[in-house]
Design a protein with these regions (language model features):
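Conserved catalytic-core motifs of GNAT/GCN5-like acyltransferases
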Residues: 32-34, 50-72, 198-210
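C-terminal "cap" of GNAT-fold acetyltransferases
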Residues: 61-96, 208-234
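Conserved acetyl-CoA-binding loop-helix of GNAT-fold acetyltransferases
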Residues: 2, 8-23, 30-33, 48, ...
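Conserved active-site tyrosine of GNAT-family acetyltransferases
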Residues: 42-46, 192
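Conserved GNAT acetyl-CoA-binding A-motif
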Residues: 23-36, 169-179
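Short, cationic low-complexity segments
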Residues: 95-126, 227-250
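Non-catalytic interaction/regulatory modules that flank or connect domains
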Residues: 105-200, 205
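Conserved beta-strand-loop-alpha-helix junction that forms the acyl-donor binding cleft
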Residues: 33-43, 52, 60-61, 176-185
């Protein structure tokens, strides 16, 4: 936390700008940040320094965190992913799920990255015999991350088996990261949503060159009135996500 007598001097903004310049000199292609939604200060600073919002992950942090001068959150805390391109990105050639195509295109427009939606022929998708997953359990926040590296014929069954294991451990939520560069993502997304996953957003260079983020909440109904976002685009994303959240009426 910043000392009260040091606040309002733009120190955080200066530090973030220095970080951005250092990363650019080191040849990095982009940076991403995650601002909590208990307040909008970090989101605002990120936007001021050129970061643009691209995903909202709900209830990913425990509610026991204390924010000086702002109290303790009532519920688990959500975060806003934002991304800053440090170089000119080549056009993103991706396979977005058809029902989220406009939403994902809006995200890339917000990031000022050109994209093209590639057609996907479900009948000609090549699947491996077995899927390749990586599961990371995050005990400090009681969450889990799943990265799906390769789609196999067992993708649905393997994901269901993994979910069963995680829910048995009473994990509060799961983030599922999918490769938008794989045609199978366009097809399997809706199948994963039938299991209770729903959209969070999309971001470049996180696990994959272009990543689709889905999320799953374990019997948690977010209080959307307590989720504070700074940018107009984040507000439109939040409404889109809320409309597709199967937990909103729990």
């Amino acid at each position: 936390a910043t000392k009260p007598d040091c606040r309002g001097q733009g120190i955080f903004t200066q530090m973030l700008n220095l970080l951005n310049e250092t990363a650019k000199k080191q040849g990095m292609q982009g940076l991403y940040g995650r601002g909590v939604t208990f307040h909008t200060f970090s989101q605002k600073t990120g936007n001021t320094c050129g970061y643009r919002d691209c995903a909202i992950t709900l209830c990913v942090l425990p509610a026991d965190r204390v924010y000086k001068g702002m109290g303790i959150p009532k519920d688990r805390i959500s975060t806003v992913y934002s991304y800053l391109p440090l170089v000119r990105h080549e056009k993103a050639a991706i396979y977005p799920p058809r029902h989220h195509s406009a939403f994902i295109e809006g995200i890339y427009n917000n990031l000022s990255i050109d994209m093209i939606s590639l057609p996907c022929d479900e009948k000609n998708i090549q699947l491996q015999q077995q899927s390749s997953f990586k599961v990371d359990i995050l005990p400090n926040v009681n969450m889990a991350d799943i990265k799906l590296y390769a789609y196999g014929r067992d993708a649905i069954d393997k994901l269901m088996e993994t979910m069963k294991m995680l829910l048995k451990r009473k994990i509060d939520g799961i983030s599922l990261y999918l490769d938008l560069g794989q045609p199978a993502t366009a097809i399997f997304c809706s199948e994963f949503e039938k299991l209770g996953f729903f959209i969070a957003g999309a971001i470049p260079l996180l696990y994959f060159r272009n990543t689709l983020i889905l999320q799953y909440l374990n019997n948690i109904s977010p209080d959307y009135s307590e989720i504070r976002v700074y940018s107009d685009f984040a507000r439109s994303m939040l409404e889109y996500i809320r409309e597709r959240d199967p937990n909103r009426d729990l």
